[in-house]
Amino acid sequence: LEETSDKAVIFAVFQTDIQQLEKAIAEKFGEGSVASYYGKTPQDERQRIIDKFQDPESELRYFISNPQTGGRGITLTEAGTMIFYSNSYDLELRVQAEDRIHRIGQDKSCTYIDLVSENTVDEKILQNLLSKVKISNEVLGEIRNWFK
C-alpha cells in the first residue's frame, strides 16, 4: 500500500478479513484513510462512503469491500489500483469487481494485484479463475466466428 500513490480498492471474501484489514490500515495510515463497505455497512452510509472515496480531495484512500457487496453497480474510478486479498470461485464476481475501477471516466491505467501464497487454497482458486477465463474466451471466440 505504501507503494501506491493513488487510491486503492481492496477486495476480501470474508468479513473477518475486511475488519482486520480495515483495522491494520487505520493503524498504519490513520482512521480517515480507510472505509469498509460490506454486508454490515448500514445502507444509509454506503453512498456517503462511495462519494467520499470518489472525491479527489478526500483523505479516504482505501476502500475495502467484498465482491458480493462492492463488486457491482458502483463506480470507484478514483482508484487506479485494485488488490484482491482473497477470491471466490465465481468468475462473474471477479470480472464485475475489476470493472469498478475500469469504467468510462477512468483516466488512469488500472493495476490489479492478487495476494497469493504458493500451495494454498488461494492459489487453487486463482488457477480455477484463470481456467474459466480461458474457457470463456474460447467459447466467445467460437460464437463470434458464427457471425462472420
Predicted regions and their residues:
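Conserved catalytic network of the ASCE P-loop NTPase/AAA+ motor domain
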Residues: 1-3, 52-57, 74-76
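Conserved interdomain hinge at the start of the Helicase C-terminal
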Residues: 1-13
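Residues at the starts of beta-strands that form the adenosine-phosphate
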Residues: 7, 33, 109-111
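Short, solvent-exposed loop/turn segments at secondary-structure junctions
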Residues: 14-18, 42, 69-70, 88-90, ...
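SF2 helicase motor core recognition
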Residues: 18-22, 46-47, 61-109
